[in-house]
Amino acid sequence: PKVQQNHNNYIISLANLCRWLAEQAEALGVEIFPGFPASEILYHEDGSVKGVATQDMGIDKEGNQKDSFEPGIELLGKVTVFAEGCRGHLGKQLIEKFNLSKDKDPQQYGIGFKEIWEIEDKNHEEGMVMHTAGWPLDNSTYGGSFMYHAENKQVFLGYVIGLDYKNPYLSPFDEFQRFKTHPAIRKIISGGKRISYGARALIEGGLQSLPKMFMPGALLVGCDAGTLNMPKIKGSHTAMKSGMIAAETIIENIRENKDLSIYEEKFRKSWVYKELHAARNVKPSFSWGLILGIIFTGIDQILFRGKLPFTLRHKHADHETLKPASEMKKIDYPKYDNV
């Protein structure tokens, strides 16, 4: 499908890109406070968002102030933009307080594992991208992998599993380890060295689960709202564009006193909305199982290019699909080979 074609794209390190962007922002006068998480939303008396307070630093596990104690500070603004990502706790507070998910489908989540490998030169093919679906998962579990051959003999390897799986014995981490034993993967990383690894949550609900993204005094951008394109397994580009639209909205709000609701109007007219609309039916179709999901996705994405005249729904939150252990078969995972 076109949604998974990466021709003429660049394979880069997102961490390096973010560091470079931080330098550009600071050169323009932006202040960045790494290591100081926002812990509390501040409100005006009328209930509109006033800003955030950062967390007190230098507190021991008993709650006592250490010598390194630094009190949190209040950061106030005419408009506060929340860009915390998929697990943003303040964003979720706002969604609940302002009922932003009214009439929306339950949000869907996944967990993704990623490793960076330095592999042997004979196994490296810079620019090569590979996606897989299914194995080692069963037919009823949503998931797939990615592999990007980057520069300097590095490979970015990862696996994403939807958290709507049914079997409580399923271990996402162990499924990823088993995935690496597949001959097609093993031959690439064999003789290599894992130099970095991590895991993070992904937001998978797409357009059907996207909440209202504005409220009095604040905006949601990126995966604090849920702009990830799940079939692409990419969300940085949509998050950045939503931030650009938010900036345009704030300028018009301050200069022309326009209502923040224009943010949603601008978002709906952007390529981000069109992209999410075209991808909207992919994730829910896999509730029918891997085989039917792949067949439907082929029809939806290749033949109709995401323009089918109907929208599939997410009928359940992820945790509601989990079945009792007594009804499911225990999964025996192979021991790690430590290779």
Model regions and ranges:
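Alpha-helix capping and helix-loop boundary segments enriched in small/acidic/polar residues
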Residues: 104, 167-170, 209-212, 230-238, ...
